[in-house]
């Protein structure tokens, strides 16, 4: 409950602490040589000893980008360089309610995302194995070093985190963010290829605080930053001219999308009767015996949340019940 309380007024900043340093495009420039793109700072800044003369940007393609500002952000024992560029966003040509080509995304753990399309494309699963492996290895490392650090000490005595543990945490965070960037980019590329007009993503506010799946499963679920993934899908979709709608998803995986069962509302204690059921992990059977991937069934129900009046023949093509394509 303390995490949902009204936040306190911030204290004064530490005069000896680290703060973000922001350079406008009047101070620093983007340049390119045979080694690729890099950030160039003026001599006055270099003489002050704040930064190096250049920061290489690797394989970033910045031909169409207009630099707005460069930020140096304190991040633990390191400094993070952020480049803010202005890009042109494609304006959607239709409204949300006019769309007929829609993609529904169900976010989970074993399958990071399950994507159903109304365009006839086979549904797609993006597996969550990689991000689970990263978190499991991270937990194992942190538990090992914490046991060495805290053995024989009371909770109020001594330090609780070393520099090595901080580096391990920062590396884990970078790897998870990289996985989410690649997954969200794959989703948007698929939607652009299929001419998708609207993406509907399921999300429940506060679901991590109220989850009860056992200690081990809770840890796996809570350690995946689902909200970060949703925000990545939103801004990348908007840049591609695709509208992104985030809706409450409730326990939509229990309702049969093929039989058009009523979808429950999250937090509502009303008892519902469903015509189909999940017969094993990852497999759902409808009233008429049609088998469908359970997560794809959930993704299809997410579309129904926003488009309940869409004609059934447009909403459920044969592609919905096909074996989904697995990628990443």
Q: Where are the regions a protein language model picked out?
A:
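Nucleic-acid substrate recognition interfaces
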Residues: 1-328
């Amino acid at each position: 409950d303390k995490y949902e309380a009204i936040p306190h007024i911030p204290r004064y900043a530490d005069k000896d602490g680290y703060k973000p340093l922001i350079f406008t495009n009047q101070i620093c420039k983007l340049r390119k040589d045979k080694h690729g793109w890099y950030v160039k700072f003026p001599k006055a800044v270099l003489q002050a000893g704040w930064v190096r003369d250049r920061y290489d940007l690797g394989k970033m393609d910045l031909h169409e980008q207009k630099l707005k500002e460069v930020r140096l952000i304190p991040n633990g024992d390191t400094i993070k360089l952020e480049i803010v560029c202005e890009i042109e966003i494609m304006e959607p040509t239709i409204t949300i309610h006019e769309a007929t080509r829609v993609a529904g995304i169900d976010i989970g753990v074993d399958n990071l995302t399950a994507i159903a399309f109304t365009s006839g494309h086979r549904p797609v699963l993006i597996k969550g194995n990689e991000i689970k492996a990263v978190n499991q290895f991270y937990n194992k490392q942190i538990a090992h070093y914490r046991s060495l650090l805290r053995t024989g000490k009371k909770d109020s005595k001594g330090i609780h985190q070393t520099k090595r543990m901080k580096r391990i945490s920062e590396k884990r965070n970078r790897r998870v963010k990289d996985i989410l960037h690649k997954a969200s980019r794959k989703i948007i590329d698929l939607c652009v290829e299929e001419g998708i007009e609207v993406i509907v993503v399921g999300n429940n506010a506060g679901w991590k605080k109220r989850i009860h799946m056992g200690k081990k499963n809770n840890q796996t679920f809570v350690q995946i930053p689902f909200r970060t993934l949703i925000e990545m899908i939103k801004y990348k979709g908007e840049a591609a001219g695709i509208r992104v709608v985030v809706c409450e998803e409730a326990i939509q995986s229990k309702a049969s999308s093929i039989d058009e069962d009523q979808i429950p509302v999250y937090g509502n204690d009303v008892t519902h009767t469903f015509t189909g059921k999940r017969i094993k992990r990852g497999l759902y059977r409808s009233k008429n015996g049609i088998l469908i991937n359970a997560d794809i069934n959930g993704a299809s129900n997410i579309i129904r949340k926003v488009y309940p009046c869409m004609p059934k023949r447009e909403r459920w093509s044969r592609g919905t019940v096909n074996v989904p394509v697995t990628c990443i």
